[in-house]
């Protein structure tokens, strides 16, 4: 909830919807503590990566970057990999750009 700046009930509803639509939710752990998560939708011709969130207490320590690196090495990940990032999330843009991702399309609206 804190990683997305959402109320607990909204976070639960978001995760339940993700389970219902067949997306994969990956937990990011450090020392036995879940510090974040990332959601993927793996299709035959691409993988959509979205919903990467790290708890504020653990942000800036490389957990998000490391999680993306690990995911990209998973054998069931298909390429290309697309990202869904809000324009205001400058930190995420910087991380993804540093990993070699490029902006190919911008959406005016996005919702779940």
Task: Give short role names for the model-derived ranges.
Residues 1-51, 55:
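Acetyl-CoA-dependent GNAT
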Residues 18-19, 29, 67-78:
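Alpha-helix C-terminal capping segments
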Residues 42, 55-57, 61, 87-88:
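Active-site acidic-Proline motif in GNAT/NAT acetyltransferases
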Residues 46, 80-82:
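Structural preference for beta-strand elements that scaffold enzyme active sites
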Residues 54, 60-73, 93-98:
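Conserved acetyl-CoA-binding loop-helix of GNAT-fold acetyltransferases
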Residues 82-93, 109-112:
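Conserved beta-strand-loop-alpha-helix junction that forms the acyl-donor binding cleft
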């Amino acid at each position: 909830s804190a990683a997305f700046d959402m109320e607990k009930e909204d976070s639960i509803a978001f995760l339940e919807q993700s389970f219902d639509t067949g997306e994969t939710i990956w937990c990011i752990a450090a020392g036995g503590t879940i510090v974040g998560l990332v959601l993927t939708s793996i299709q035959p011709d691409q993988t959509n990566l979205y919903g990467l969130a790290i708890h504020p207490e653990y942000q800036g320590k490389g957990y998000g970057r490391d999680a993306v690196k690990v995911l990209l090495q998973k054998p069931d990940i298909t390429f290309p990999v697309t990202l869904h990032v809000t324009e205001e999330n400058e930190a995420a843009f910087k991380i993804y750009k540093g990993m070699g991702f490029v902006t190919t399309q911008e959406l005016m609206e996005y919702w779940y």
